[in-house]
């Protein structure tokens, strides 16, 4: 066959392309164009099966190459199926309300001009830091508006050509215009204490004094003072209130306010006893005519005699025992603490109405020698000190000489072993607890001690030591 001389041919050229070749070339050109505009890998309906061919999941068509699938996507069948799928999804989807767009209300106000300002250059004396102080005047600022500021770079503004060497500080407050200050483009130190100011006022510590009211006529009460923080004023404190004792102890009783009775001055007063402690009782022992050795274990007492305090009288006639509620200690109570001196031997309670004599007036019993002054032997536990050479008498038994007159009428002598109580308002002498004989309760209210028989009356100081009969022989 002569391929060189066919009609329509050109010498030196190839043969005329057939129709199949022309179609293949066209499809290749379309595929290249489609790949430039469409990414086939992102198509949700494109799928490559296990045989190496391509499928369209929307139209369920099979394609041998990518160009065939791209030509299908541009065809009528694929486009119709896309429109049908979109309508079906729109119908099945629930009607959802469109999200409301947040509308920012533009503030509308009439600008009244630029505010006044003052700029001051400063330098820290310690650190050497440079700073700028901006003082902006906003005398007519809107109610509830606080001035705001921000830093703007040179590339954000549209007023001047951008220059990277400068930045702008903007200050805004309605209804004034926003103003800007051109400052060097350096880093701002925004540390605490370096950037902001705070101005504050202290509250008034004392309220203003109320106007003084004129003094009214006598007998008219003035209105009460105003309340302080809703609380009434505190009452005035007494002038002579003693300070509270240390250690949480109760306050001692107040001293009597009446005039002190006249009497001979005495030694300084001893401190009042602790609450619930009885005063020391004067132990009365009859003087003896002979000298007897002291009982074993008995220590001689101290020669120092503490008379009653100045201005304290003995109990008057008809004085009752102490107030109810005060019980004497039980038998066997220990003697007073160290530092408390027991009564001297031979000291008798004075008669009613007679002031106590000075210390050392009563003569000692014959043959009794007091110990050396300044010697204070410690009392032993449970043993009362006795005079040297004096036997402790039997409890509640005091022998009397025959012919001794009974006490005057109206005078209640104290029972043996019963401690006399001072009149009300008078504090006892030294603190200390003395044992009471069993069976005697002077604290029972309303009970008077029975008068002592004439033969058992305590000897009087006027009797003298020579008139004392010898003690009866012991059993």
UniProtKB/Swiss-Prot annotation:
One of its GO terms (cellular component) is nucleus. The modification Phosphoserine is found at residue 153. Residues 208-285, 293-306, 314-380, 448-475 have a biased composition (Pro residues). GO terms for biological process: mRNA splicing, via spliceosome; RNA splicing, via transesterification reactions; U2-type prespliceosome assembly. It comes from the Eukaryota. Its main location: nucleus. Found in all tissues examined. InterPro entries: Matrin/U1-C_Znf_C2H2 (IPR000690), Matrin/U1-like-C_Znf_C2H2 (IPR003604), SF3A2 (IPR052092), SF3A2_dom (IPR031781), Znf_C2H2_sf (IPR036236), Znf_C2H2_type (IPR013087). GO terms for molecular function: nucleic acid binding; zinc ion binding. Residues 1-27, 208-475 are annotated as: Disordered. The modification N-acetylmethionine is found at residue 1. The modification N6-acetyllysine is found at residue 10. Keywords: Acetylation, Metal-binding, mRNA processing, mRNA splicing, Nucleus, Phosphoprotein, Repeat, Spliceosome, Zinc, Zinc-finger. PROSITE patterns: ZF_MATRIN (PS50171). It is found in: Nucleus. A zinc finger (Matrin-type) spans 54-84. Component of the 17S U2 SnRNP complex of the spliceosome, a large ribonucleoprotein complex that removes introns from transcribed pre-mRNAs. The 17S U2 SnRNP complex (1) directly participates in early spliceosome assembly and (2) mediates recognition of the intron branch site during pre-mRNA splicing by promoting the selection of the pre-mRNA branch-site adenosine, the nucleophile for the first step of splicing. Component of the 17S U2 SnRNP complex, a ribonucleoprotein complex that contains small nuclear RNA (snRNA) U2 and a number of specific proteins. Part of the SF3A subcomplex of the 17S U2 SnRNP complex which is composed of three subunits; SF3A3/SAP61, SF3A2/SAP62 and SF3A1/SAP114. SF3A associates with the splicing factor SF3B and a 12S RNA unit to form the mature 17S U2 small nuclear ribonucleoprotein complex (17S U2 snRNP). Identified in the spliceosome 'E' complex, a precursor of the spliceosome 'A' complex. Identified in the spliceosome 'A' and 'B' complexes. Belongs to the SF3A2 family. This is Splicing factor 3A subunit 2. It comes from Mus musculus. The gene is Sf3a2.
């Amino acid at each position: 066959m002569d391929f060189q001389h066919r009609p329509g041919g050109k010498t030196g050229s190839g043969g005329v392309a057939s129709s199949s070749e022309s179609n293949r070339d066209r499809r290749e050109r379309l595929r290249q164009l489609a790949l430039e505009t469409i990414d086939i890998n992102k198509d949700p309906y494109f799928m490559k099966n296990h045989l190496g061919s391509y499928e369209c999941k929307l139209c369920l068509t099979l394609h041998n190459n990518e160009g065939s699938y791209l030509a299908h996507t541009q065809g009528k069948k694929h486009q119709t199926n896309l429109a049908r799928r979109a309508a079906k999804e729109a119908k099945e989807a629930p009607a959802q309300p469109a999200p409301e767009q947040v509308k920012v209300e533009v503030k509308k106000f009439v600008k009244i001009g630029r505010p006044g300002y003052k700029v001051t250059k400063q330098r820290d004396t310690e650190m050497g830091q440079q700073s700028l102080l901006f003082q902006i005047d906003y005398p007519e600022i809107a109610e509830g508006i606080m001035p705001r500021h921000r830093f703007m770079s040179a590339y954000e503004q549209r007023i001047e050509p951008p220059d990277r060497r400068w930045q702008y500080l903007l200050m805004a407050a309605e209804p004034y215009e926003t103003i800007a200050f051109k400052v060097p483009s350096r880093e701002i130190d925004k540390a605490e204490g370096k950037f902001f100011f705070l101005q504050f006022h202290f509250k008034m510590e004392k309220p203003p004094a109320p106007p003084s009211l004129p003094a009214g006529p006598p007998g008219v009460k003035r209105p009460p003072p105003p309340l302080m923080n809703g609380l009434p004023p505190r009452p005035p404190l007494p002038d002579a209130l003693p300070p509270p004792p240390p250690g949480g102890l109760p306050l001692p009783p107040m001293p009597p306010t009446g005039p002190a009775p006249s009497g001979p001055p005495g030694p300084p007063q001893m401190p009042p006893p602790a609450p619930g402690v009885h005063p020391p009782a004067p132990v009365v022992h009859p003087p003896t005519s002979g000298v007897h050795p002291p009982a074993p274990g008995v220590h001689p007492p101290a020669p120092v005699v503490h008379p009653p305090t100045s201005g304290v009288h003995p109990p008057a006639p008809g004085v009752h025992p102490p107030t109810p509620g005060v019980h004497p200690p039980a038998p066997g109570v220990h003697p007073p603490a160290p530092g408390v001196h027991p009564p001297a031997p031979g000291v008798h309670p004075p008669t009613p109405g007679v002031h106590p004599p000075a210390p050392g007036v009563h003569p000692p019993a014959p043959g009794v020698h007091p110990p050396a002054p300044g010697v204070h032997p410690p009392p032993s536990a449970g043993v009362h000190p006795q005079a040297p050479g004096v036997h402790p008498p039997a409890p509640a038994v005091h022998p009397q000489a025959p012919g001794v007159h009974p006490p005057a009428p109206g005078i209640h002598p104290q029972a043996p072993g019963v401690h006399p109580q001072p009149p009300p308002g008078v504090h006892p002498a030294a603190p200390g607890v003395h044992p009471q004989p069993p069976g005697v309760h002077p604290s029972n209210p309303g009970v008077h001690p029975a008068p002592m028989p004439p033969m058992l009356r305590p000897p009087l100081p006027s009797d003298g030591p020579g008139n004392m009969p010898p003690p009866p022989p012991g059993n």
